Amino acid sequence: MKITCIVTILALLSLASKAQTQGINKNYNAQLAKALNADDYGMKKYVLVILKTGSKSDLPKATRDSIFRGHMTNINRLADAGKLIVAGPLDKNALNYRGIFIFDVEEIEQAKALVETDPVIKSNLMAAEYLSWYGSAALKETLKIHSTIEKVKP
């Protein structure tokens, strides 16, 4: 009976030890995780913004062109400030979605304040939908990498 109990205890301790070490990433970089505000899963909260066709569409071409130049300038400003992590257009679609932004902010209100600085939003050429999104904290590194592969800056 004593031997059975001892063997059972040793087996349970062995299983508990394996459970604790299982899933631990050998490549884990605590300093980088902290710098990127990553949680234990390497993830963090962002705000995903879907840009869609707005209520204003009858502007002269010269005005639209000027607004879109301002839009690109604003994108670059927000990216340079480290707030805008991903931005890009979408192909034509039935939902009239035009593009996306992913902001390195946790609250939708913070993203709204940033989006409201964009000329396409101010002019109502586009409107925005906001969603909280939980994704890889490494996404923030995209900007550093992108700047090394971008031959022409828009």
Regions from the language model: what does each represent?
Residues 20-154:
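Conserved, structured core segments of small domains
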Residues 1-24:
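Bacterial Sec-dependent N-terminal signal peptides
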